Amino acid sequence: MKRLTTITLILGLFLIANAWNSSSLVADDVEGTYWNAEKTAHIRMYKAKNGFYYGKIEHLVEPSNAEGTPKKDVNNPDETLKNRASLGMVIAKAFKWDESEQKWNDGTIYNPTDGKTYDSYIYFENGNKDQLKLRGFVLGMTWLGKTSEWTRIK
């Protein structure tokens, strides 16, 4: 009987320790620098003073165009923004942490390649904090979109 109690106690402690190790994410886990999916840029995810999370291009593998001048946001549909530098551009905006869903919702992601901004949410699949998944979609329909994966730079 004493042996059964000891085994039960050890098993209970093991389950508690296992639950502790697989604890849920916290909002600031997204902060850090990532390679984009194409491995052409580093994007730094950070928490702004307003409590939302943003992503800014901090490094470009090829920062200049063929003419040797810094790359610009030439595909932007807003004529006033076409001349802004790609380096330093904020492309992920206003993501809000949702504890219950374990993801950052209600943000937008700007794709400099096509000049379009998409509704978006971001998350770590299976708690893997080295691979940030971004789901961009249109018309509020999450199934009508594309998922991209950014890799954390350590």
Q: For each predicted feature, which ranges?
A:
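N-terminal helix-cap/turn-to-beta initiation motif at the start of protein domains
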Residues: 21-33
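A mature extracytoplasmic/lumenal domain signature
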Residues: 38, 47-49, 57-59, 124, ...
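Bacterial N-terminal signal peptides
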Residues: 8-18
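Positively charged n-region of N-terminal signal peptides that target proteins for export
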Residues: 1-4
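Central antiparallel beta-sheet cores of small beta-barrel/beta-sandwich binding domains
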Residues: 31, 42-120
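Conserved interaction-surface patches within small, structured recognition/assembly domains
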Residues: 121, 130-135
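Edge beta-strand at a domain terminus
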Residues: 129, 138-154
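Short acidic, glycine-rich loop/turn motifs
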Residues: 36, 109-113, 136-140
